[in-house]
Amino acid sequence: MENAHAKTAEECLAFFGVNESVGLSGEQVRRALEKYGHNELPAEEGKTIWELVVEQFEDLLVRILLLAACISFVLAWFEEGEETITAFVEPFVILLILIANAVVGVWQERNAENAIEALKEYEPEMGKVYRADRKAVQRIKARDLVPGDIAEVAVGDKVPADIRIISIKSTTLRVDQSILTGESVSVIKHTEPVPDPRAVNQDKKNMLFSGTNIGAGKAVGIVVATGVNTEIGKIRDEMAATEQDKTPLQQKLDEFGEQLSKVISLICVAVWLINIGHFNDPVHGGSWIRGAIYYFKIAVALAVAAIPEGLPAVITTCLALGTRRMAKKNAIVRSLPSVETLGCTSVICSDKTGTLTTNQMSVCKMFIVDKVEGDVCSLNEFSITGSTYAPEGDVLKNEKHIKAGQHDGLVELATICALCNDSSLDYNEAKGIYEKVGEATETALTCLVEKMNVFNTDVRSLSKVERANACNSVIKQLMKKEFTLEFSRDRKSMSVYCSPAKASRAAVGNKMFVKGAPEGVIDRCNYVRVGTTRVPLTPAVKEKILAVIKEWGTGRDTLRCLALATRDTPPKMEDMMLVDSTKFAEYETDLTFVGCVGMLDPPRKEVMGSIRLCRDAGIRVIMITGDNKGTAIAICRRIGIFTEDEEVSGRAYTGREFDDLPPAEQREACRRACCFARVEPTHKSKIVEFLQSFDEITAMTGDGVNDAPALKKAEIGIAMGSGTAVAKTASEMVLADDNFSTIVAAVEEGRAIYNNMKQFIRYLISSNVGEVVCIFLTAALGLPEALIPVQLLWVNLVTDGLPATALGFNPPDLDIMDKPPRSPKEPLISGWLFFRYLAIGGYVGAATVGAAAWWFLYAEDGPSLTYHQLTHFMQCTHHNAEFEGVDCDIFESPVPMTMALSVLVTIEMCNALNSLSENQSLLRMPPWVNIWLVGSICLSMSLHFVILYVDPLPMIFKLTHLDLAHWLVVLRISFPVILLDEALKFVARNYLEA
């Protein structure tokens, strides 16, 4: 049923053709079940394991590697002699890498538990209904409820469907609907229609929403929506419709993979075509097919060389290390790629309650009447320090510390706060903090009494548990609470009836203490308390009091004010009819006004500094809250989102004002605004969508079920540690301490991680460029193989992988939070950097080929060939006069290959040092600024020595031992790469950046 909240109870009953006292007939239930289905949320269709596995192989680079492995495997079958084992190593290793990558990918996907499944926990098991087949109320499975059912709910129940209240069977009906609307206090419900068809859920005071909890009272209503048609069901549908976009890094790597695969394919084909003339060379036994297969193997080697196989593992390791560092700062990252996304966050949309504020109501101001002379009235105003539930803080008057017990008015004010109160403080020893037991507003009053300590109770020797309610206990020993007149909407107040606890104090007599909304309470006051006496409340005095309350409620602070009053001579207890709540207002008359307290949910201490940091870092902070606009703007001013006297028109909107704008203006509003008040969850999703249309990278905080769709839609969904399971499972990050400052620390960490990732991605890519150049040169010049695929795999995975991982530990730049967020469209490798890595890669390739050629041409233990002989080695036979005196087996020697591999590994280690900083010289940033890098270089070189000198590894890798003379040549060829990169950095620093 649409807009049930705007209809009368009678209209709702007529719509479903049902009688409140009888309920639906069996036939009506059957028809409704056919029409609306069962009252449950459909389960999410998950992907099968097979679908997840196939997904892992959709990446182009992975497919090229898979093809290379299959081809190598087929070619290995046709190998002869002792090379058979070596031939099988390569496809086996490639397959192992692919399987490991797929396992990690599938495991990560399976681990991201489904937020839609978590919604199920809000579905109650049972419901209570009236139906025509039974005279009394009956319990049925909640899934069998249908629209039109007459349902009953009572304190402690979970609401089983969306229900329009028909009648309330208790004084009040309080509902905790925080999971759905984010309201921090329970809401009082009524039965009258809400005439606004566009009312937000917070304003639908005659509706009960599925999954929310009844805090107090009992009611009967008619079910108006079940299953996916409930408010919680709409959230489920919105989440199911939200597609998860790829993170900026994933998009970059995908683009890079596509470009790389095209380049690889071109080079492989080129190498094969260049050598068509060599297919018939004698070395292939004159067989054109064997020659074609030989060069096909070289093309496969090229593919293996060009793909940085170690990259996925290094990225995962770097992100995992980043998540550990973030966890230490209370930011628990649930999805690894989002660590990097945090680095480009340009807008943070933050909830107010609990994130920017403490979510611990505290009284910060109060006043009592000092003097009344005729129509002139002067007030004593006090301020109170301390912004949490901890009973620590001072009472100040004109910025000076005072003892509250010296003011009679404050003693009575503290008495009312302690007795007219059903809440208390509790010290949580596990967390080491004070927490509320009961309503936030009342707990603030309990805390105020502790700070005031009007009877000078000695609290120094008490434990924290005893300290929680020490001063309240003293007051409660003086007066005994007989009964409570519950809060009701019509009078907007509550009261307690108290009698003196001891016979000695009988002279005081019984009292009624009242607290409530100032207008309602003051209207029922006839007197004002001045010291220990009372004087009549004249219109002028009343006006003065209300003026101060209005100023407190609308000024910079927008405090929530409560008036406190006493009825000095209440009726006798036996004369009061407590069963009839309509009489309560009558008993709360002839009151004496005692004072007023102003409270607020105070901003967290560290938030102002964090917002300043965001501004310096070019990040816009938008506050989104369910509170009213005045309060929202006041908090924005207090924490620095708006300055004290900044004009906020066009920069702050309520949900209703936002809805009234045409779509183009809504989009523009999202570009300018920094504050949205009185919003619904759908607004949050809309705001995220509009921000994304400006290419903003948005972080969105939330804690309720209602926030889940927006959390899922934003690039970075941030759930509160104290939030619901649904919010947590829909988010990328959870704040263990619910603190806004933690988000800013996480953004800083994300920026540092991205900078380091850029360094190691570039390091690995320049290494691969070197390997490609090496193989291309050997094929193009007709030289013997310098490197084979199994060696390339070893270098890509192990030797390069360790320093690349260590580059993830580079210290962050000092000015990292002084720069604007990087654009998600910024390329991973710019034109200049591409040139740099081509230059470095070109040197790496040429040096590797040069090392192998050096042994053939110039080494003392080498064959001392001519350049012509080396480049035409395929024509070497005993009958060829050009190769007279040359043993053709020399071209199979492992020494030149070992030289080439050793030069490649040593150059890569030098290159890792170059990658400490993008443009800083090694003289400014010496290697020991990242001790992990120094350690990983030592480990990589040690592993290289292992495959050279520990049998049987040299046989598997087709290598041999090198002597000192060889190593000196390796170092001479490798070291210049540092000088080359220093020259390129110098150009970048002095000519490009300038």
Swiss-Prot record:
**EC category name:** translocase
Where is the secretion signal located? none
Quote the record's binding site residues for Ca(2+) 2: 768, 771, 799-800, 908
Q: Which Gene3D superfamilies match?
A: Calcium-transporting ATPase, cytoplasmic domain N, Calcium-transporting ATPase, cytoplasmic transduction domain A, Calcium-transporting ATPase, transmembrane domain, HAD superfamily/HAD-like
Enzyme Commission numbers on file: 7.2.2.10
Catalytic machinery residues: 351
Tell me the residue ranges located in the Lumenal compartment per UniProt: 70-89, 274-295, 778-787, 852-897, 950-964
Q: Which residues are on the Cytoplasmic side of the membrane?
A: 1-48, 111-253, 314-757, 809-828, 918-930, 986-994
Where in or outside the cell is it found?
Answer: Endoplasmic reticulum membrane; Sarcoplasmic reticulum membrane
Give the UniProt keywords, A-Z: ATP-binding, Calcium, Calcium transport, Disulfide bond, Endoplasmic reticulum, Ion transport, Magnesium, Membrane, Metal-binding, Nucleotide-binding, Phosphoprotein, Sarcoplasmic reticulum, Translocase, Transmembrane, Transmembrane helix, Transport
Q: Where does Ca(2+) 1 bind?
A: 304-305, 307, 309, 796, 800
The activity regulation comment is: Inhibited by sarcolipin (SLN) and myoregulin (MRLN). Also shown to be inhibited by phospholamban (PLN) in vitro. Enhanced by DWORF; DWORF increases activity by displacing sarcolipin (SLN), phospholamban (PLN) and myoregulin (MRLN).
Record's GO cellular component, any one?
sarcoplasmic reticulum membrane
Cysteine pairs forming cystine bridges in this chain are 876-888
Q: Which residues cross the membrane?
A: 49-69, 90-110, 254-273, 296-313, 758-777, 788-808, 829-851, 898-917, 931-949, 965-985
GO process terms (BP): calcium ion import into sarcoplasmic reticulum; calcium ion transmembrane transport; calcium ion transport; intracellular calcium ion homeostasis; negative regulation of striated muscle contraction; positive regulation of fast-twitch skeletal muscle fiber contraction; regulation of striated muscle contraction
User: Which residues are noted in the entry as ATP-binding?
Assistant: 353, 442, 489, 515, 560, 625-627, 678, 684, 706
Single GO molecular-function term? calcium ion binding
Say what the protein does: Key regulator of striated muscle performance by acting as the major Ca(2+) ATPase responsible for the reuptake of cytosolic Ca(2+) into the sarcoplasmic reticulum. Catalyzes the hydrolysis of ATP coupled with the translocation of calcium from the cytosol to the sarcoplasmic reticulum lumen. Contributes to calcium sequestration involved in muscular excitation/contraction.
| Comment on protein domains | Ca(2+) and ATP binding cause major rearrangements of the cytoplasmic and transmembrane domains. According to the E1-E2 model, Ca(2+) binding to the cytosolic domain of the pump in the high-affinity E1 conformation is followed by the ATP-dependent phosphorylation of the active site Asp, giving rise to E1P. A conformational change of the phosphoenzyme gives rise to the low-affinity E2P state that exposes the Ca(2+) ions to the lumenal side and promotes Ca(2+) release. Dephosphorylation of the active site Asp mediates the subsequent return to the E1 conformation. PLN and SLN both have a single transmembrane helix; both occupy a similar binding site on ATP2A1 that is situated between the ATP2A1 transmembrane helices.
Give the record's family classification: Belongs to the cation transport ATPase (P-type) (TC 3.A.3) family. Type IIA subfamily.
Name of the protein described by the UniProt record: Sarcoplasmic/endoplasmic reticulum calcium ATPase 1
